[in-house]
Amino acid sequence: MYTGQSDHRPEGVGVNPGSPNVMEPGGGVANGAAVTPEGHYSHAPSSALQAVKKNINHMSGLSLGLRVSEFVLSVIAFSLMASAEQNGAVYSTFTSYSFVLAINVLVALYAIGQIILSVMPLVSGSAPKKLYLFITFGCDQLSAFLLMAAGAAGASVAMLINRKGVIDDYGSGCIDGKITVFCAHAEASIAFTFLSFFCVMISSYLGVYNLAPYLIL
């Protein structure tokens, strides 16, 4: 029946009987899914990159354990070397032993910083930044090289003392027992230096694993 009222709709508004969505003025959609404006696309990260970042987060726990080991081993190493003293013999008498102590102090400080930075991804659940991974890899390489050099230098001096002794001020050195405690502390410090070196090397290998996706993808 004609009621005298015309059915007027605002321009741009239409109803599709076969669709649950009703267009409203301004181009919106009522009772339906949101429409992405033309020219805008959602770019989801690739599944490969997502998997890699997930694995990196899982490796953060192992990395943290290695950092703690590096710190503990380096602290023990420089503590033993600093306490190496007997009958006037001290670590500063030998340049290589001073080098061992100095490098272990540096590595211990570096490990503290890495422990703090390693906790952050575990707490936040986010993947480390690419720049951080590159810097960490370089620092790990440098730390490993310095620890290896210090350990090798200290080991060569320890072998020289054990085989030929130190004739000048300490009799026959470790042979006649005048500085056996000094020798024992120095040798133990060198051993812990090498253990710290191996932990840093493993951390460096993990750094390669973490960096690989950013270099390939």
Swiss-Prot record:
Any Gene Ontology CC annotation: plasma membrane
Disulfide bond annotation, renumbered to this chain: none
Compositionally biased intervals (Basic and acidic residues): 1-11
Residues passing through the membrane, by range: 62-82, 99-119, 142-162, 188-208
Subcellular location: Cell membrane
Membrane listed as a keyword: yes
Region (Disordered): 1-21
Topological domains, Extracellular: 83-98, 163-187
InterPro entries, A to Z: CASP_dom
Keywords, comma-separated and alphabetical: Cell membrane, Membrane, Transmembrane, Transmembrane helix
Ranges in the topological domain labelled Cytoplasmic: 1-61, 120-141, 209-217
Topology term for the membrane: Multi-pass membrane protein
Assembly and oligomerization: Homodimer and heterodimers.
Similarity-based family: Belongs to the Casparian strip membrane proteins (CASP) family.
Name of this chain's protein: CASP-like protein UU4
